[in-house]
């Protein structure tokens, strides 16, 4: 552990650097209230550098935090910053709009959070495996194409454009949809998924010579409904990072397109709020970045996740507070949505 003065110096260097983006010297620290001479402060900064908590850029006499320094700060010195009422009001107004579908809320939450912070935001909605199927229909687009739609009891909607095989006429298609609805409406998606691989094909084959493509379509759409969707807001904000200095950092943009990697990134959900820095993110493309992840719970509807990804030099005290309040506001918005859905059920 550090001495009280070393704690104060490290705290002030990180606080100033995350806000100004410039190396911090002894003069600035004296102006910030560090009660010591310039020589003493420089000696303490040198000690912190030897501990691996600070780095001295070649072109400056000041110091900047290292990833290890940020980790120490987060673990021992970080104090959440109180948000202004106007900032909370903006959140509430942004999340208080009318939403018609659950995924719309989750997607918009990522965009709203990104706009509020100027960082990249990631959002995952509550678990959908306990949702029930309330409708499957096909709407004609032209002679050979339809849009297939699956709806659940909690407002999840999946749709996909489908070309009708020549061996299937429109009348047979309507009958197939009717049978699927008769047998599966009201069932949990997990049961629907299981029955789709067992008795439903047998039932359809009793009535039709071919079910070419229809069952595959329904199966694919259910897989989409089951998949934990991660919505990304402000992806281009990754390019605004001061840490981006070579082509490897630009590859982090492609990382945002890989849902499997994003799921792995957000797989740790054992704490309400957590901060991971650099190598803790488990991906070389994010080695100079930090992730602040907040989990929330919707009673009877499972858990969701909202997160911020950005430079390791982000202002943690402000971002931590903002994310904490945002997750509560998002949970309230989702709870209101579910209650409105339940009231119609």
From Swiss-Prot:
Keywords: Repressor, Stress response, Transcription, Transcription regulation
Listed InterPro entries: GAF-like_dom_sf (IPR029016), HrcA (IPR002571), HrcA_C (IPR021153), WH-like_DNA-bd_sf (IPR036388), WH_DNA-bd_sf (IPR036390), WHTH_HrcA_DNA-bd (IPR005104), WHTH_transcript_rep_HrcA_IDD (IPR023120)
Stored Gene3D superfamilies: 3.30.450.40, Heat-inducible transcription repressor hrca homolog, domain 3, Winged helix-like DNA-binding domain superfamily/Winged helix DNA-binding domain
HAMAP family: HrcA
Entry's family note: Belongs to the HrcA family.
PANTHER family referenced in this protein's UniProt entry, alphabetically: HEAT-INDUCIBLE TRANSCRIPTION REPRESSOR HRCA
Name used for this protein in its record: Heat-inducible transcription repressor HrcA
Species the sequence originates in: Tetragenococcus halophilus (Pediococcus halophilus)
Gene this protein is translated from: hrcA
